[in-house]
């Protein structure tokens, strides 16, 4: 009986030593190498535009202070944006509350500050009305430095502002951003082509990880 007790004690001691060794190894484990991190959208030295002015409008970062006018803008154009921007019934939809709109603005602001993506409101010069939005984001498809998307309200689209905004934004990105190859889904790249590229990228990623 005593022999069994000694053996059990020795086994428990070995387990404790192994566990402490694992803990120490975890404590001193180096951070992931840069090769495993997602590439940065923009270099650390790049000064991100925080205010840009075009003919009859200005671009400013989306944030909580714009929650009300942003909400009013997209809620005025639900069918239009579902058809031309998200291509989905999920956004915008009639049930979006003011609280949800505020949470979205806080999230956009956080991503902007973290330099993960950059969302801008397209405002009238006096800042009282939102004409649309512009988004600069990482590309899910290899070969592109960034994806730029934009929308305008139904009223602005009917007035011809969409085409003018696209032309201005493409020149702004070319001159003021550090990208060489930018994707404009639904603009210079047809939606069907872009969705095919995304599907192919996901399929390739799945095969690679198996």
Task: Walk through the language-model features, giving the residues of each.
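Boundary at the C-terminal end of the N-terminal hydrophobic targeting segment
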Residues: 23-25
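GNAT-family acyltransferases
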Residues: 28-156, 168, 172, 176-210
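Bacterial N-terminal signal peptides that target proteins for export
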Residues: 1-10
């Amino acid at each position: 009986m005593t022999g069994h007790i000694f053996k059990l004690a020795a086994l428990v001691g070995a387990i404790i030593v192994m566990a402490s060794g694992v803990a120490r190894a975890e404590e001193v484990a180096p951070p992931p190498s840069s090769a495993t991190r997602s590439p940065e959208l923009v270099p650390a030295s790049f000064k991100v535009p925080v205010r840009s002015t075009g003919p009859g409008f200005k671009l400013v970062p989306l944030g909580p202070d714009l929650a009300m006018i942003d909400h009013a803008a997209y809620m005025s154009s639900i069918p239009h944006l579902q058809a031309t921007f998200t291509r989905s019934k999920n956004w915008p939809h009639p049930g979006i509350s003011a609280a949800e709109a505020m949470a979205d603005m806080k999230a956009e602001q956080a991503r902007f500050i973290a330099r993960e993506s950059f969302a801008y409101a397209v405002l009238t010069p006096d800042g009282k009305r939102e004409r649309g939005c512009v988004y600069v984001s990482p590309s899910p498809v290899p070969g592109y430095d960034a994806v730029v998307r934009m929308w305008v309200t139904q009223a602005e689209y009917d007035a011809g502002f969409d085409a003018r905004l696209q032309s201005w934004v493409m020149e702004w990105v070319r001159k003021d951003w550090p990208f060489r190859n930018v994707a404009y889904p639904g603009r210079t790249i047809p939606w069907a082509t872009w969705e095919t590229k995304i599907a192919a990228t996901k399929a390739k990623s799945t095969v690679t990880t198996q």
